[in-house]
């Protein structure tokens, strides 16, 4: 039995989980609604404010899908209840971010400002000029949006300049030693 998959998912008050016969899972909560189609071989049941995920056999593919499906549904339940957020820091001289309406505009040392439109269900916040918070209810979209922002200036190992996640540790390298 999958160590992740065998655990039931507790459904908090105020959240409804529905599963159609073709494994379309809908989770509604105070922050919104998420719909995801799960693999047809995995059995999903909602009983007594718990979601129980079971697999039909012990084939390797079914074992893998068992834990994955349970984790995806759990992420949906947490997302509509609490939401997800990722914090990015801009490190470098002149690197800064600001909001123009819903659009994120960043100065990253290019000849032009970088403008990023939020995808559906994602919002940006800039509590400081060098800090960007990506918020949303879908964990996958929040991570993808944060990764899209980060790829504009990946942190470099010599000075540590670039866009990094809040608790990310950049492995630093020593520069060349000059001749004497």
From Swiss-Prot:
Q: Quote the SUPFAM superfamilies the UniProt record gives.
A: Ribosomal protein L6 (SSF56053)
List the Gene3D superfamilies: Ribosomal protein L6, alpha-beta domain
Ribonucleoprotein as a keyword of this entry, yes or no, is yes
Question: Is-annotated flag, keyword RNA-binding?
Answer: yes
Q: Where are the transmembrane segments?
A: none
Give the highest taxon in the source lineage.
Bacteria
InterPro entries in the cross-refs: Ribosomal_uL6-like, Ribosomal_uL6-like_a/b-dom_sf, Ribosomal_uL6_a/b-dom, Ribosomal_uL6_bac-type, Ribosomal_uL6_CS
An example Gene Ontology CC term for this record = cytosolic large ribosomal subunit
GO BP, one annotated term = cytoplasmic translation
Molecular function terms, GO-annotated: rRNA binding; structural constituent of ribosome
Record's keyword terms, sorted: Ribonucleoprotein, Ribosomal protein, RNA-binding, rRNA-binding
Assembly with partners or alone: Part of the 50S ribosomal subunit.
In terms of HAMAP family, this protein maps to: Ribosomal_uL6_B
Role noted for this protein:
This protein binds to the 23S rRNA, and is important in its secondary structure. It is located near the subunit interface in the base of the L7/L12 stalk, and near the tRNA binding site of the peptidyltransferase center.
Give the record's family classification.
Belongs to the universal ribosomal protein uL6 family.
Question: What is this protein identified as?
Answer: Large ribosomal subunit protein uL6
Q: Which organism is it from?
A: Clostridium botulinum (strain Alaska E43 / Type E3)
Gene that encodes the chain? rplF
């Amino acid at each position: 039995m999958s160590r992740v998959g065998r655990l039931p998912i507790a459904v908090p008050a105020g959240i409804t989980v529905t599963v159609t016969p073709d494994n379309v899972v809908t989770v509604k909560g105070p922050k919104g609604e998420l719909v995801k189609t799960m693999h047809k071989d995995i059995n999903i049941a909602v009983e007594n404010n718990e979601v129980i995920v079971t697999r039909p056999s012990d084939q390797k593919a079914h074992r893998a899908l068992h834990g994955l499906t349970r984790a995806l549904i759990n992420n949906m339940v947490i997302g509509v209840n609490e939401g997800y957020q990722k914090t990015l820091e801009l490190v470098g001289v002149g690197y800064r971010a600001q909001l123009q309406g819903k659009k994120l505009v960043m100065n990253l040392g290019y000849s032009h400002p970088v403008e990023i439109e939020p995808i559906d269900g994602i919002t940006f916040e800039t509590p400081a000029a060098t800090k960007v918070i990506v918020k949303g209810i879908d964990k996958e979209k929040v991570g993808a949006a944060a990764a899209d922002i980060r790829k504009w200036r990946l942190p470099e190992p010599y000075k540590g300049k670039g866009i990094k996640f809040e608790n990310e540790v950049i492995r630093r390298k020593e520069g060349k030693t000059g001749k004497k």
